[in-house]
């Protein structure tokens, strides 16, 4: 398939004034004549005006090589539009091209290795036939068979010549089909530009819109059926619009939205605009949802999805010394919180080490310091094979020790 780059570079296209707006050019004689008729007698002022006029004239006459869009519009403007009978003829050749390319793909389907595998299988089949028949064909038998089939050397040469003739005709039809497809596409590139202009300022540059629209035009040329009686431009318009709108949906946003959601957002905007004109005020969410036959919850979800992302580095305030990210609460732990938690764990271990081993183990199990699960007095008693009351006494004694200023002074810093 011809790529969009080929569409933009292979064309050799009179300038279509409907597609671009060029300022009217003036030559030096017009400028000088205008200046002579000026009643200003100040020579210095006249000299400055003359120099300014010449600079403007030079700017107007800059080569278009600095503006690729204008060059492209000039080139495609030189391509003549097709007549109805020409469209039909080109469409027939393109349909023939598609059939030939399918045939060509079928013949080129196997690689050399795969063809070798096919030959190997044929030889295996031949060997099995020989084994089953329990005898090998003799040379005399082969000669007799060839004599019956009348495969003479002149006949084989005639077949070879015919195959070369057919291959040459096949290549010619492929070439003419591809040229017909090129001509059909190039003759309708102005249609792509006219449609692309309607989708400007939607997230893609004008060049990208033309590129995507050209791909849609190529697809239209391949799918066009002239027997249905439609003009090609009418048929191609849908394909061009579809290619452009899908590209906008896929590429224009930082966070990609599904195409169907993008289309719904476009319908919401259009409905809002229509209701605003009818009511002469901004419509409410309920009015928009009722008009579009959807729930308010779905409307709000789609509207929220349509919001554009904003950078966390966006300056805030008159002095612009703060950033948006400074005012957003983080869901996870900050580095400071993580460091503080690690220090608390270390200090808590040091304090627990001042207790007896049994007191330390009871507090660990009671408050879930190891696995995060707090155990009951009865569960801990079963672990140590003592009564529930004995565990309560051990816990109370350990807590009294921890309340001593020599032990809890370090831990109090974390709760201030």
UniProtKB/Swiss-Prot annotation:
Motif (Interaction with polymerase core subunit RpoC): 208-211
Keyword tags: Cytoplasm, DNA-binding, Sigma factor, Transcription, Transcription regulation
GO cellular component: cytoplasm
InterPro entries named in the record: RNA_pol_sigma-70_dom (IPR014284), RNA_pol_sigma70 (IPR000943), RNA_pol_sigma70_r1_2 (IPR009042), RNA_pol_sigma70_r2 (IPR007627), RNA_pol_sigma70_r3 (IPR007624), RNA_pol_sigma70_r4 (IPR007630), RNA_pol_sigma_r2 (IPR013325), RNA_pol_sigma_r3/r4-like (IPR013324)
Region of interest called Sigma-70 factor domain-3, as start-end residue ranges on this chain: 263-338
Location (main, coarse): cytoplasm
Stretch list, region Sigma-70 factor domain-2: 184-254
Family named by the database record: Belongs to the sigma-70 factor family. RpoD/SigA subfamily.
Protein name: RNA polymerase sigma factor SigA
